[in-house]
Amino acid sequence: SFPFHPVGQTFTQRKDQTLSNITSTAFAMGSKGSSLDSQPKLGFNPKLYQDSKWCHDTPGTVSEDQVINIFTQEEIMKVLPMLPVVPRSISLKVGQTLFLAGVARLDVLTGPGSEKWQNHPLVLTIFASDDLPINIVETEQAEEFLSQGLKSDILKVPSSRQNPQRLEEFPELQGQEFELYGISDEESSCDIVLSSVGWLAVTTRVTLSYLVKAWTPGGKGLYLRDLAFLPYSVNLKGSKIRGTPYYGQSRIFIP
């Protein structure tokens, strides 16, 4: 959890008692000459306990694979989904690169060896915050695109809008190669985990294989999940948008 504002106190002794009165009383505890002893004590009141509001903050673990700790508060608001995640699907061919904002990247290095299937696309279903834009470029232009995109702030994260030195502080993207195999055009075979940013579900025809390279800041949290977490999510994609590698989004019922 990331509290951005003070958590107030809901217990009061009287309806007209303010939070400032309560906190001043709390800070007066133990001081000489305090009138605390003359004030009525606030004991346990089951009804008051039931009607009050609570914020429970459970302790988390710190992992070297987490990238969430490198983001500023402004960036966290974009990286962490504030609404239910709606999967977005794209198709990539050999020699193309996917950028997820400026915090993750995927290159398709090689594809099926068969001439019949060498142009068959690799479908990726992206599970990440909608505030992280998706861009697809030719791999040979990827470095230039990333450099220009970060300077112009179109990638959104990392952002140098408030701190011009932010791009110098932000860890460079580092990559790791993975070999992928397909099982069906209607079922994802595996996931590429991108640390705290999200993951990519991989879908392609059975027997086809690809070599890809995934990137995250500092190369942290890159894993291949052998079994897709949501293997049939690829079927939620809409029709292919003509002339682009993007699929439309089907309407998803969220209760």
Predicted feature residues:
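Helix-rich effector regions associated with P-loop NTPase G domains
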Residues: F2-P255
